[in-house]
A protein has these predicted regions:
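Flavin-dependent oxidoreductase catalytic core characteristic
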Residues: 1-151
Length: 151
């Protein structure tokens, strides 16, 4: 059960770490949470949803074109992690904007937002690449690469 501390610890344990570790599990959970909210709102366009979402409302303005696409609400795990990385950065941008509102140096805020914007743009390009790799099964014949290496 994920609502119990023992269940949460199992999810965050070694067998469930995929790419970089437990951070990827968190990115996946971010995506799942946002996708659930999108389903409830009956909204499939990511930019439209983020523009109305409290934690990303102003940051979404930086991505009028970049995030203006329909999200498949049943993504594979790898894509959930990629989307979570994007969403995490957009939320961080919102927090950065709020820091600027409270008087933090505007030049540092502007620089930070530019860096995050470029990072999100780059990650969206990777995310939107639809070339999904698949498992190759029964590849025994002709697959011993050592046979093709000159010693």
């Amino acid at each position: 059960r994920l609502d119990h501390v023992a269940g949460r610890s199992v999810v965050d344990s070694r067998p469930f770490q995929i790419f970089e570790g437990s951070n990827d599990v968190l990115y996946q959970q971010i995506s799942e949470s946002v996708l659930k909210s999108m389903r409830l709102a009956k909204e499939r366009n990511l930019h439209a949803f983020l523009s109305d979402f409290e934690m990303t409302r102003r940051a979404a303005d930086y991505f009028d074109d970049t995030l203006d696409f329909e999200v498949d609400l049943s993504l594979p795990q790898r894509k959930l992690v990629e989307l979570g990385r994007i969403l995490g950065r957009v939320v961080t941008m919102e927090f950065t904007i709020e820091m600027g509102d409270r008087g933090f140096r505007s030049d540092l805020i502007s620089n930070c937002l530019q860096v995050f914007q470029k990072d999100v743009d780059s990650r969206v390009t990777t995310y939107r690449n639809h070339d999904l790799t698949e498992v190759v099964e029964d590849y025994v014949e002709g697959s011993a690469w050592l046979d093709y290496v000159n010693a």
